[in-house]
């Protein structure tokens, strides 16, 4: 915090107020580019040099994630190992330390709710004390804890994990999916984030990419990515709105598409509004009804709650296509009178009534986005729906009422974001040359000045990359250092906005208040990540940082997490190798026993007994498979296979010789018969 005392760092005060017209001329010095020149700079900035190999596009979603790659001029969504085009963003840790990701993790959530993490994207880049985090703590079965840096982390089996780590485990699954398809290592990626993510959340997402072993070339906004997916093959110029209501976040972006240039005019949203909230609202309704009917409170039973949570999600999805659904959960819980079953009918109208306030919360951001973009609903040529929640008929009707037109269904709401990320990857790799993306910063950026006022340097919806400087001065006589507090938000007082970070400029020569000239420069890169510098114009002394909040992951944290992720990857590889070897061994045992039964009359008894001993040894090895390597199991299985092949070869030879013997004796008898007939 900037102190007003002489000894400590003082609050900055705008130089224009203390130095008259001269200082005023220093204010608001943009990087001085015309619009056309800016576009040329942006084109250059958006084309990365010497990118080798494919660039994968990843939609790291709250509920589900998706990965796509460019094939020529078309983006292709890839199927994971389970054959699905989207992967649940769920990570679980079993009692024996095994890590599960995706559908395997989701499937065991009912029996392991305390160690199964879902929707952790809502925690990424957030402090433990944030009101949203405190609200989440009451709604999830797993433990959210305060990390040593004040951030919100999660805990499983006594181990702490940052939300970036959990995101990295999901990204590793996406990376593996891409590598299985490509047939080689996937290193470069474009990852999407909600448009309304602040700097801390964007930085934490980049950290997740780094932990997973990816080189994150660009972090782009989800609605912008969806617009790329929609508009890549469109030739006409138009203004579009992208309404993105996903699993955990809501974004609205207004874009202008003109001859391959995708220019974001404004963006708005709510980073704590999505399908998870709809599930939670329905869950509360079900629990309340169950308590009214049975007198049993389910909120103390995590396993029962997890079953209700899954049933609520399923019912929500079914009501998008049906007007009524049944929720049946037998043996949900029990009391002294015996087991209790849940059986409930739910209509679409009832569900809409339960979540109507959540849907209404999307209206104000849409109106604000249109106002900021200076467009009316009649100017918008198309409304694109993105995110699974936009399948809900009531949401679609709300969008239609809001924009005065039926929304387009031209893109797949689950896949459009990953497709757009892959297209941006193609742009960065130089494979897609006729597309330019001009995005914006979603929130205003500035510093705390005298009296705790938030002084904005860069307003929201400014096109990025961008750079802006402003000159400030000291607030006290003889002040030798100033503390720069960097904030992001729209409130008038700095304390009401998100504190991104702070740093101190020292060594200012003592002078009366208002005399020193301190130039503060904000530079936002194409990822939307903030770089700040402060320079004493009198001495030339400069201090600069890439903003990292007082929380966030340090370089050492990230390096340790990268090592842990590599360790997990190695463990996963060994586990897979062992499972494959066990499957091979069990197959060989089955085949051997089947053949022994089939050829028992042709096989020597002593050789059979030897082979049975080999099978017994193999079974003993498989009984302790968790402590054996895949290579040991494979070698033992191969040895058994070789022994069985030799034995069955003997059986085949014996059978063949018996057939030949019976065939020749049959021929001799035939000749004797012919002789008798002639006589």
UniProtKB/Swiss-Prot annotation:
The keyword Amino-acid biosynthesis does not apply. Changing residue 489 to E: Significant loss of interaction with FXN and ISCU. Significant increase in interaction with NFS1. GO terms for cellular component: cytoplasm; extracellular exosome; focal adhesion; MIB complex; mitochondrial inner membrane; mitochondrial matrix; mitochondrial nucleoid; mitochondrion. GO terms for molecular function: ATP binding; ATP hydrolysis activity; ATP-dependent protein folding chaperone; heat shock protein binding; protein folding chaperone; RNA binding; ubiquitin protein ligase binding; unfolded protein binding. Residues 442-679 are annotated as: Substrate-binding domain (SBD). Changing residue 128 to C: In EVPLS; impairs ATP hydrolysis activity. Impairs thermostability. Increases the propensity for aggregation. Residues 1-46 form a transit peptide. It catalyses: ATP + H2O = ADP + phosphate + H(+). The modification N6-acetyllysine is found at residues 76, 135, 138, 143, 206, 234, 288, 300, 567, 600, 612, 646. Its EC number is 3.6.4.10. ADP binds at residues 63-64, 313, 316, 320, 388, 391. InterPro entries: ATPase_NBD, Chaperone_DnaK, Heat_shock_70_CS, HSP70_C_sf, HSP70_peptide-bd_sf, Hsp_70_fam. The keyword DNA damage does not apply. Interacts strongly with the intermediate form of FXN and weakly with its mature form. Interacts with HSCB. Associates with the mitochondrial contact site and cristae organizing system (MICOS) complex, composed of at least MICOS10/MIC10, CHCHD3/MIC19, CHCHD6/MIC25, APOOL/MIC27, IMMT/MIC60, APOO/MIC23/MIC26 and QIL1/MIC13. This complex was also known under the names MINOS or MitOS complex. The MICOS complex associates with mitochondrial outer membrane proteins SAMM50, MTX1, MTX2 and DNAJC11, mitochondrial inner membrane protein TMEM11 and with HSPA9. The N-terminal nucleotide binding domain (NBD) is responsible for binding and hydrolyzing ATP. The C-terminal substrate-binding domain (SBD) binds to the client/substrate proteins. The two domains are allosterically coupled so that, when ATP is bound to the NBD, the SBD binds relatively weakly to clients. When ADP is bound in the NBD, a conformational change enhances the affinity of the SBD for client proteins. This is Stress-70 protein, mitochondrial.
């Amino acid at each position: 915090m900037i102190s007003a005392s002489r000894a400590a760092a003082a609050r900055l005060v705008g130089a224009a107020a203390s130095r008259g017209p001269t200082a005023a001329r220093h204010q608001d010095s943009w990087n001085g580019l015309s619009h056309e020149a800016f576009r040329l700079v942006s084109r250059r900035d958006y084309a990365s040099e010497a990118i080798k190999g494919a660039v994968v596009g990843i939609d790291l979603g709250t509920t589900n994630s998706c990965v796509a790659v460019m094939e020529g001029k078309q983006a292709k969504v890839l199927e994971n190992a389970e054959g699905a085009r989207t992967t649940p963003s769920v990570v679980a840790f079993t009692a024996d330390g095994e890590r599960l990701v995706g559908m395997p993790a989701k499937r065991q959530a009912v029996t392991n709710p305390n160690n199964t993490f879902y929707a952790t994207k809502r925690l990424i880049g957030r402090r433990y004390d944030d009101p949203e985090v405190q609200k989440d703590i009451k709604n999830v079965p797993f433990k959210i804890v305060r990390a040593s840096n004040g951030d919100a982390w999660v805990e499983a089996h006594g181990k702490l994990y940052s939300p970036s780590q959990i995101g990295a485990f999901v990204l590793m699954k996406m990376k593996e999916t891409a590598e299985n398809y490509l047939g080689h290592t996937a290193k470069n990626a474009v990852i999407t984030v909600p448009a309304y993510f602040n700097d801390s959340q964007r930085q934490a997402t980049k950290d997740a990419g780094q932990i997973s072993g990816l080189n994150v070339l660009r972090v782009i906004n989800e609605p912008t990515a969806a617009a790329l997916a929609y508009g890549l093959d469109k030739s006409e110029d138009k203004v579009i709105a992208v309404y993105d209501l996903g699993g955990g976040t809501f974004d609205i972006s207004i874009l202008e598409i003109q001859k391959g240039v995708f220019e974001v005019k404004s963006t708005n949203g709510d980073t704590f509004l999505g399908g998870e909230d709809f599930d939670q609202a329905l869950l509360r309704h079900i629990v309340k009804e169950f308590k009214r009917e049975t007198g049993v409170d389910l909120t103390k039973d995590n396993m029962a709650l997890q079953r209700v949570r899954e049933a609520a999600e399923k019912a929500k999805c079914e009501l998008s296509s049906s007007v009524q659904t049944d929720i049946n959960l037998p043996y949900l819980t029990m009391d002294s009178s015996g087991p209790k079953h849940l059986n409930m009918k739910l209509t679409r109208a009832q569900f809409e009534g339960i979540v109507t306030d959540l849907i209404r919360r999307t209206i104000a951001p849409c109106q604000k986005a249109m106002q900021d973009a200076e467009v009316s609903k009649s100017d918008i040529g198309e409304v694109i729906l993105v995110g699974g929640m936009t399948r809900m008929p009531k949401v679609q009707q709300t969008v239609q009422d809001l924009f005065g037109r039926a929304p387009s269904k031209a893109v797949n709401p689950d896949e459009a974001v990953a497709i757009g990320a892959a297209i941006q990857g193609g742009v960065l790799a130089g494979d897609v040359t006729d597309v330019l993306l001009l995005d914006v910063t979603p929130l205003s950026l500035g510093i705390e000045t005298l009296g705790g006022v938030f002084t904005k340097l860069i307003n929201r919806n400014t096109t990025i990359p961008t750079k802006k400087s402003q000159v400030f001065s000291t607030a006290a006589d003889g002040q030798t250092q100033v503390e720069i507090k960097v904030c992001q938000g729209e409130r008038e007082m700095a304390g009401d906005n998100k504190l991104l970070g702070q740093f101190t400029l020292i060594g200012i020569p003592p002078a009366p208040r208002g005399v020193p000239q301190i130039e503060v420069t904000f530079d936002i890169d194409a990822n939307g990540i903030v770089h700040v510098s402060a320079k004493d114009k009198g001495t030339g002394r400069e201090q600069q940082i890439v903003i990292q909040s007082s929380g966030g992951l340090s370089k050492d944290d990230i390096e340790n997490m990268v090592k842990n992720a590599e360790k997990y990857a190695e463990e996963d590889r060994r586990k897979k190798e062992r499972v494959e070897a066990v499957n091979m061994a069990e197959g060989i045992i089955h085949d051997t026993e089947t053949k022994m039964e089939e050829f028992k009359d042709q096989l020597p008894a002593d050789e059979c007994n030897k082979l049975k001993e080999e099978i017994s040894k193999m079974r003993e090895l498989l009984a302790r498979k968790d402590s054996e390597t895949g290579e040991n199991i494979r070698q033992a299985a191969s040895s058994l296979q070789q022994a069985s092949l030799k034995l069955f070869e003997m059986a085949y030879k014996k059978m063949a010789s018996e057939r030949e013997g019976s065939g020749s004796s049959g021929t001799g008898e035939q000749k004797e018969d012919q002789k008798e007939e002639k006589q």
